[in-house]
Amino acid sequence: SHDTQRILSCLSDAPPKDTLTREQQAEYQYKPEAVVRGKRRLYAAFALMFSMPQPPCIYYGDEAGMMGLSDPFNRGSYPWGREDPEIRSFVMQLSALRRCNAAMSSGKTAFAAPCADAFAVLRCRGEESALTLVNRADHTVCAALGAEDFREGPDALNVLTADKYSDAFTDGTVLQKDLGTGHIRVEIPPNGFLLLLSQTAE
């Protein structure tokens, strides 16, 4: 919404907009390390949004890395030619994944919370499965998830995890289900995410 501060500003630890005067907002300088952390959080937020059953909705410019606190600083002109190339490329990749993957775009949906700092979305359609996990903590979260852990959402307890997943955004790391427990073991990076796509049996 155009009535709220930009998401990248919020995730880069900007102070609440009501605590600064308009002049202070105009001159506010973000700490570089906070922006780096903010981008990691932004990628996790985008990954979560694109994994949900409803159509993704992005406020113009968020995909370009625009920042700003309250009006009018949150409603600047689109930065043509000055977009953040990494954020823009990431959103394009996410969009392509959702468009080409039936599970992400129209699959059954169920949710799980491995711990207080992590959240998981499982989407399934036919033979395809997409598992998205986000971590809001400043440390790595390790978890082991099975289909029985997905107890919330419209299709709770009516979804299945795949036997094998590959990481869609890193090095293509393949994760296999433990056939004894039926669980997939994952390590979710600090302030980050994993987006895992099922692999067909060879």
Question: What are these language model-derived features?
Answer:
Residues 1-202:
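Active-site and adjacent substrate-binding regions of carbohydrate-active enzymes
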